[in-house]
């Protein structure tokens, strides 16, 4: 067989192999145990020494050419496979980069910390208490009688079971119980705020069954309604970082304060200019509540207020729907990062 023809056939066969398996099969035709070149090498023993030397050299040259073609095709197939994998795993550098998002405080938690900071700066302590309360601390101690509508299951989440004294358990409807607990553990003068989660049977665009509230209490021998007005007005100006806030106190009713007032505020400028916005409930602490705190109402007097942290956050940032704070939509939350 013509060696040049064998080399040409091998090169053509190798070039036509579409994958490694086919290439190895084609290799066996030329370099395998029964391959064309192998058979020629086996036949050298039949030749005389001089012819064997000459023919063996020619066959070895042909074999080297076939092996070179084989290795070249192997490399080409390996490169093609690598390029295919790279294409499948390629990163499109024309796409916008995705930055590593930095964590940030929830807007309501920003308000929580800001409120704490402001009141700490004027001498108030910060207290915390249980979210599962007894009806005595949540209602009775705060001068809410047994037949008060707030005690109904339509307004309050009750918990199965009772405490060690047989009192009913519930999810606190405000953080006022912590004021009673704090006052029973500390002697006047008492200046404290109690921020925390509270629960009521309510849910719409401006109400949530779980919401955050901050309540404040100042009790001493000579604390007046004027002190309440001064403290809360100063708080609003610091919280909203503006001095164009007008504040009014509207007569109202709360069982735990007497007299009681709703606190409204109005901006002189901006999109809420000219609108009175309800911001808090307040009043002089009722003598019965002071007595339930273990204090003498003939000697001590004070004021209390309560504000929704979501409400403050909505007004500060211009949020219209309370439910946005609880949906965990990153598009919304990133605006406050």
Curated annotation (Swiss-Prot):
Entry cofactor note text? Answer: Binds 2 magnesium ions per tetramer.
Catalytic function, reaction form: tRNA(Phe) + L-phenylalanine + ATP = L-phenylalanyl-tRNA(Phe) + AMP + diphosphate + H(+)
A GO biological process of this protein is:
phenylalanyl-tRNA aminoacylation
Query: Where does this protein have coiled-coil stretches?
Result: none
* SUPFAM superfamilies xref list: Class II aaRS and biotin synthetases, tRNA-binding arm
One term of GO molecular function: tRNA binding
Q: Known Gene3D superfamilies for this protein? A: Bira Bifunctional Protein, Domain 2
Family note? Belongs to the class-II aminoacyl-tRNA synthetase family. Phe-tRNA synthetase alpha subunit type 1 subfamily.
Name under which the protein is recorded: Phenylalanine--tRNA ligase alpha subunit
Q: Which gene encodes it?
A: pheS
